[in-house]
Curated annotation (Swiss-Prot):
ATP binds at A299, P300, T301, G302, S303, G304, K305, T306. This is CRISPR-associated nuclease/helicase Cas3. Its cofactor is Mg(2+); Mn(2+). It comes from Methanothermobacter thermautotrophicus (strain ATCC 29096 / DSM 1053 / JCM 10044 / NBRC 100330 / Delta H) (Methanobacterium thermoautotrophicum). Its EC number is 3.1.-.-, 3.6.4.-.
Amino acid sequence: MAMMELIDIIRAKSNDQRNYLLKDHLKETVARIDDFHNFYQTNREKFSYKIGEKTFRALAMASIIHDLGKIDYNFQKKLMGDDSEAWEVLEEFLSPLKPLKRSPRHEILSIIWSTFLLGNDDLDAMMRTAILLHHYNEYFLNDKDLMEIIFTYRDAFEIYLNFIIEKKETLRIFIEDILNYIQNSLESDLVISAADEIRSNMDFEKPELLLEKIKEYDDDISEFAAFYEPEERSADILILSGILRRADYSASAGVDIELFSEEVFRDIDEKITSKIGGAPWQIRLMGELGGPKKMVLVAPTGSGKTEFSILWAAKHGRKFIYTLPLRVALNDIFMRLRDSDGYFSEDEIDILHSTAFIEYLKEERLGRGTDLDSMMTSARLMASPALLTTPDQVLITSLNYFGSDKVISVYPFASMILDEIQTYNEEMAAVIIKTLELVNEVDGNILVMTATLPPYFRSFLDAMNFEVMDVAAIPGAHDIKNLNLKRHVPQLIEEPLFNDELEVSDKLGKILDENSEKNVLIVVNNVQKAIELYREYQDDPDVYLLHSRLLEKVKSQRIGEVKKRSQDERGLTVISTQIIEASVDIDFDLMITEISTIDSQIQRWGRIHRNRDADYDSGDPNIIIFTDSDRRTSLIYDKKVLDATRAILERYDGQILDYNLERSMIEEVFQEEIDGSTLKEIYENQIRETISDLDYFTVEKRTQAQRLFRNMAGYKVFIPDAVLRYSESEIERTFAELIKGDYRLWKDILGEIERITGEKTTMWDLKKVLYEYSVNVPVFYEEKSDFWSRTTGEFKGFYVWGSMEDDDVELLEELGLDSIFGETESSLIV
């Protein structure tokens, strides 16, 4: 067999994918390393983690070697089938591997190639480890040791080594052909030096020596080819393996590994000045501060913190990664920043969260020609110059999940913005702080933004040398929106809004009658309360129910309708859980709320008198708080904090409050002493204990880490019967029927839809249907409901409830999940 035939036959993936030949995938992966090397050279001064030429050469070598384990009988047969002419040729060559009934994963077989193509110093050990873990396998959690790997796969390794020994002359020429093909295609000094070093290292006598050691149970096998496994978490291996993974994945997807250019921030001062008008405080403050690398910005809700974050990122000339906890709010910011009069062009900014593709579909519907696959892939690989994302995508790397290195490798060239830090409870705060410590370790840039900095965060941020800037201290700060505006007059009602039997206080109806010409927001502490309260008013078209366990489509429609109507109409009432706090930019006239912790209270108040130019000068209260706790509230909030909150609220009952007074209330609550310690100290100790536990914590996959992090850990459940009841689209209805009928492959589903309807659709359009007609089911429903008896299957990460009664579908659409199950006690409130 001619050697060119071999290099032109061996595949890396099926032939319906781009660059399916192994030589082309390796070339494209090396090209990404070369591109990243050039990007690094251009932006060297902006990187806080320095990468030398020797390290880049090692990365290029690893990218050539990483998939050589795909030279395997079983792998190639699976890709090619039995009847192709190419397979007939290749089958003969790979026949020594035929006795392998089940081959090890290709990245494990690639380790054999690394034993005679790489050296054995510390850098080689890092690259060998990165090769082993460029896909998930058991060695992510287990010891990475050559002896352990060999004796786990002893028979397979002996067969594979014998294959290499038998075919060594052919394989020597094959490797030389691969090296020539790659370096001639790319014509790069880095690639040439990497290829030359592989040639220098290449020693086909080593497989014979290794096989001999295996047969003799030699004690020094582990030293034959070292792995990198430091006693403590190492930023070095995480960054380098992350770069290799990004190169591999972006090569497979056909997207660039890095898209940043300083042009992304061109004329940003002028754009912000034009949009805001006058002399924006953000530009003044940036001029005075010089943009410290680690900073906390404390500024009122609605004052323009997002604009400041863009200026801060521009000052440092790094990619802009902005995180916000709630998807709905993030979607709004994405559309605002990417709009025709926004700050970024369409190809400069991406969005990444579990339903982000829906935002791209909206863009496509507007005729903007978005390439969904490329946009989503580049966002996932952190290639975008500007990225909006939820924290569970980029700020949970301290949970040590597989693939976290891909995110960590971006930290040294990113300006990370963490907005709404006050929304995290102590456990989530610990994860965030631990991750910030990791970003700090690689000297990354971090901007924390908040309207109300929780006092218990301060000591952890101080330890990382964050500079705290309170806009109230800026000279001439009087023009900052909502800073000095007197916005809120609280009134306390010393009884619970609900009793333990979920009966509503008689005073609520009277308050609503007296304020019938106002837009009223009622915030309660759990979903069941919201549903029970809404039942009393559900015939009124001006009353809306909002919470997290509605169908996604219904929730989005209601939020959009409330936003639109509230601009011109009065007399609307929204009954909500605190999902409203950070997700919906709506200005209400009056809030009625249950007692909660002081920081949560003031967060809620931010929806009242939000977008006004003048002080609130009515003598009537616009914040009404039912201050007693019922049993359900006690399940959610710490009694110590509620008692302290209640005491502080009593001091300010009936007073008109501005932003500064409200912040001082938070400080007062957390200075309250309980058993010799302040609340602030109690929270700090709880966070420290959790951080300490994280030192020994690892989860296997990112989805597991996200589930641990999210305030509401749960399952997404698709409801096909809701599609059949409410959708008028024949394509959507056919899709629902197919899922009910147990179709599970996109290829089959798309083909069947076209056959039945005569119309073509895309996977992305059907994914949109999945999300819109899904509901979030908390994990505690698993044990306290008939969750599993309703579940008829799974599809693409969703559980499927394939047989629901019409009455249940109606209840789900109008009231949400809890109306079907009834009340299930939990501390979850959204």
